[in-house]
Amino acid sequence: HAAIHAAPLAPAGHIDAKDWDKSVNINLRATGILIPMIEPLLRAKSGAAQFLDDPHAGEKFFGAYAATKTAQITLARSWAAETAKTGPKVHIATPAPMPTATRARFFPGEDRAPLASPRDEAKRILSVH
């Protein structure tokens, strides 16, 4: 699951209500809706779900994004523990920083040259599982 809303970075006291709602709906609520829908399909085919973590929780200005992303990953961890014996497998990976649109929104003007290739990072994550 890689769908995410990257709300504008802002101090917690300045988080816009619309951005907060959108962050909760996309980053957390959608995950809670998708899991019951896809679990039977994944279990029937011995499938797996992949979640992508982001280590920005607790950093200044990342409040809306980090709070909802952390909640999403917590839900995924619970699901992984619940299905460890029965399936589906639930994987959580922390990709290396990559030159994505989300990262560009958070770090405009960043030198993107040293960032990991999305193709290489995808291969790395998929090879682990």
Please report, for each region that a protein language model flagged, where it lies by residue:
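A short, exposed helix-loop element centered on a Lys and neighboring polar residues
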Residues: 35-36, 77
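Catalytic loop of short-chain dehydrogenase/reductase
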Residues: 4-11, 17, 43-85, 94-97, ...
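C-terminal helical subdomain
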Residues: 85, 92-93, 100, 108-129
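A hydrophobic alpha-helix adjacent to the NAD(P)-binding/active-site core of NAD(P)-dependent oxidoreductases
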Residues: 15, 23-24
